[in-house]
Amino acid sequence: LIKSMGFAPENIILCDTKGVIYQGRTEGMNQWKSAHAAKTDTRTLEEAMKGADVVFGLSQKGAFSEEMIRSMADRPIIFAMANPDPEITPEEVARVRDDAIMATGRSDYPNQVNNVLGFPYIFRGALDVRASTINDAMKIAAVNALASLAREDVPDDVAAAYQGNRPRFGAQYIIPVPFDPR
């Protein structure tokens, strides 16, 4: 999906438990990994994170170290989405970076990435137009709608879920909360 949204494929490096998924690698490869193999000399997650602007973690607790986060580009965006424990916690990131934007899969941290924000609405839209598949255009429309919603002022009923603290778009609020009825 990120390629469909305009991310340059040559700037994307995928990793698995064996390291970087690169062109020519044979160990642990399959047709899906091969389709996204990078042309790179980078071989480890640690190397791949050096200078990176964004990292998406979908693995396990502890996969990202403070040193890896420190090595990223200025103002890095970190999606640490392993559940129940993210690859690195916001507290760990804050020890080494004061410029990071971070999201996790956990409701007790800011910027919870939760599929409940998209699934019911994407499915409702597909039903309404009698679509037989969910395509990238539908997913991108959902992404754009959520991004727009995060930039809007938060209504009183949503602010109540924050114990009266009204979130505003910024590093601590890039994703609407699941309680948001809009």
Task: Cite the ranges covered by each PLM segment.
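Alpha-helical scaffold segments in soluble metabolic enzymes
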Residues: 1-4, 47, 51-54, 67, ...
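Glycine-rich phosphate/diphosphate-binding loop of Rossmann-like nucleotide-binding domains
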Residues: 1-60
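Adenosine-phosphate binding glycine-rich loop
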Residues: 80-181
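Long hydrophobic segments that form regular secondary structure
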Residues: 42, 46-98, 115, 130
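Alpha-helix boundary/interfacial micro-motifs
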Residues: 27-28, 33-35, 70, 99, ...
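Ser/Thr-centered flexible coil motifs
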Residues: 28-30, 65, 135, 155
